[in-house]
């Protein structure tokens, strides 16, 4: 029974780590130094 509980916690920790990692990377890309390379397609479009 102990093995199943340990596997569950390991899976939960892995999923939380991946979620926080992707969220952190997204925030870094949106607001960090790489954000200077992003372009706004609505600003580029001329009517």
From Swiss-Prot:
Q: Which InterPro entries match?
A: PSII_PsbN
Membrane-topology annotation of the record: Single-pass membrane protein
- Gene Ontology biological process: photosynthesis
User: Its domain of life?
Assistant: Bacteria
Major subcellular site = membrane
GO cellular component terms listed in the entry, alphabetical order: plasma membrane-derived thylakoid membrane
What does the UniProt keyword field contain? Membrane, Thylakoid, Transmembrane, Transmembrane helix
Q: Which residues cross the membrane?
A: 9-31
The answer on whether this UniProt entry bears the keyword rRNA-binding reads no
Query: Matching PANTHER family, A to Z?
Result: PROTEIN PSBN (PTHR35326:SF3)
Q: Which NCBIfam families match?
A: PRK13183.1 (NF009650)
Chain's role: May play a role in photosystem I and II biogenesis.
Task: Return the protein name.
Answer: Protein PsbN
Q: Which organism is it from?
A: Prochlorococcus marinus (strain MIT 9303)
Could you tell me the gene encoding this protein? psbN
């Amino acid at each position: 029974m102990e093995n199943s509980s340990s596997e569950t916690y390991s899976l939960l920790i892995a999923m939380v780590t991946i979620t926080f990692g992707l969220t952190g990377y997204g925030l870094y890309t949106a607001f960090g130094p790489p954000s200077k390379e992003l372009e706004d397609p609505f600003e580029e479009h001329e009517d």
